[in-house]
Amino acid sequence: SVGFKAGVKDYKLTYYTPEYETLDTDILAAFRVSPQPGVPPEEAGAAVAAESSTGTWTTVWTDGLTSLDRYKGRCYHIEPVAGEENQYICYVAYPLDLFEEGSVTNMFTSIVGNVFGFKALRALRLEDLRIPVAYVKTFLGPPHGIQVERDKLNKYGRPLLGCTIKPKLGLSAKNYGRAVYECLRGGLDFTKDDENVNSQPFMRWRDRFLFCAEAIYKSQAETGEIKGHYLNATAGTCEEMIKRAVFARELGVPIVMHDYLTGGFTANTSLAHYCRDNGLLLHIHRAMHAVIDRQKNHGMHFRVLAKALRLSGGDHIHAGTVVGKLEGEREITLGFVDLLRDDFTEKDRSRGIYFTQSWVSTPGVLPVASGGIHVWHMPALTEIFGDDSVLQFGGGTLGHPWGNAPGAVANRVALEACVQARNEGRDLAREGNTIIREACKWSPELAAACEVWKEIKFEFQAMDTI
């Protein structure tokens, strides 16, 4: 007789194991599974476990050459999603042996690879991952982290302020550097290259780096504060990216920037290693994230991309605002903000956190609030994000009627007023507008900003109901 039974068999016979007790070394995943009509949830969950680990669609004789029990993913728990018809959260455990050490790329290729095109599922979304400490320890993580960044910048007890230079495309390098100088001189801590500023014909990267470095040093000398500009090192090849980072280091600037999703995790991890070795901070922009995370039934939740970034490495990452033009629901946003900053996060389904996660002292990442925010939002932002954050006002600085430097002054005054009020025990949520109005009395720059933006609101239905 043949040594194995050929043919197609149900995934659930091998990969659905409700009695399995998860190991501390397993990578755990929570998938939101929408099976095709007629496909039972156990089969759908088992199919996800199989296709993202050792399985294939039919029995193969080479299965006999290995121990499936040792290497297979297991769907160990399934629960229906309240309020949704035929949708389930399927929990899958993956043995650690399946993954290459220190490679986010390999982890994602397995867990969110082919399985997302699987025909038995209408849709599939990865909601959360539990990264075991044994795997966390194979990554360097953020180049420096929150505490080291504060020590490098000598800035404590308040959020940091940034500004994206606009118009994002079309300025010459010298005019760009001038805008950087004005913002930093006015009182911001950082300015930022837009994510799509790389090295275009109207402004090559080397010219931009030089003029921005000049702006940094001039504003530092005049204000006595340490300043930075996120020089975007993202490039078409990894070699070119590192070349740009090397030039930034030679200029002596404090921070560079990378678009980690369009650039890719392999490139990002290389850059993070370079930044740690050379004392550069690394600002991460999440361009392309909404392609992956915006639909609630398919793709990947941003909290997974945030965890992946903390492993791959970055000191800042954009994380939504809760209040501006880009969406983000408060509790869910705060859930992944805590995942970025804290060393230990408890499971809390109300905040979208499916697993308890320990980071074994991997440095934290500063969340960046950016997108359609202005001075009237300052009390809410200070309250929601706390001190360990970067608040970035692009149009909210450069749109000031008197120019860039007064725009920066307005933001800095508003921030200092909110921090002082909070430290005095006032309630920012209730008294926010009053605090800003009081500060307007002694800051004409802030008063002018408040007048311009008093009516602006970005209020639409939440998008992820599609």
Curated annotation (Swiss-Prot):
Entry annotated with the keyword Plastid: yes
Any single Pfam family the record assigns to this protein: RuBisCO_large
One MF term in the entry's GO annotations: monooxygenase activity
Compartments where located: Plastid, Chloroplast
Gene Ontology, cellular component aspect: chloroplast
Cofactor list: Mg(2+)
Alphabetic keyword roster: Calvin cycle, Carbon dioxide fixation, Chloroplast, Disulfide bond, Lyase, Magnesium, Metal-binding, Methylation, Monooxygenase, Oxidoreductase, Photorespiration, Photosynthesis, Plastid
UniProt modified residues of type N6-carboxylysine: 192
PTM-bearing positions, type N6,N6,N6-trimethyllysine: 5
Domain of life the protein comes from: Eukaryota
Reaction(s) this enzyme catalyzes, per UniProt: 2 (2R)-3-phosphoglycerate + 2 H(+) = D-ribulose 1,5-bisphosphate + CO2 + H2O; D-ribulose 1,5-bisphosphate + O2 = 2-phosphoglycolate + (2R)-3-phosphoglycerate + 2 H(+)
Cofactor note: Binds 1 Mg(2+) ion per subunit.
Presence of the UniProt keyword Transcription in the record: no
Binding site for substrate: 114, 164, 168, 286, 318, 370
Gene Ontology biological process terms from the UniProt entry: photorespiration; reductive pentose-phosphate cycle
Posttranslational modification: The disulfide bond which can form in the large chain dimeric partners within the hexadecamer appears to be associated with oxidative stress and protein turnover.
EC nos: 4.1.1.39
UniProt family annotation: Belongs to the RuBisCO large chain family. Type I subfamily.
Function, in words: RuBisCO catalyzes two reactions: the carboxylation of D-ribulose 1,5-bisphosphate, the primary event in carbon dioxide fixation, as well as the oxidative fragmentation of the pentose substrate in the photorespiration process. Both reactions occur simultaneously and in competition at the same active site.
Other remarks in the entry: The basic functional RuBisCO is composed of a large chain homodimer in a 'head-to-tail' conformation. In form I RuBisCO this homodimer is arranged in a barrel-like tetramer with the small subunits forming a tetrameric 'cap' on each end of the 'barrel'.
Subunit structure as annotated in this protein's UniProt entry: Heterohexadecamer of 8 large chains and 8 small chains; disulfide-linked. The disulfide link is formed within the large subunit homodimers.
Protein's name in the database: Ribulose bisphosphate carboxylase large chain
Lineage, opening ranks: Eukaryota, Viridiplantae, Streptophyta, Embryophyta, Tracheophyta
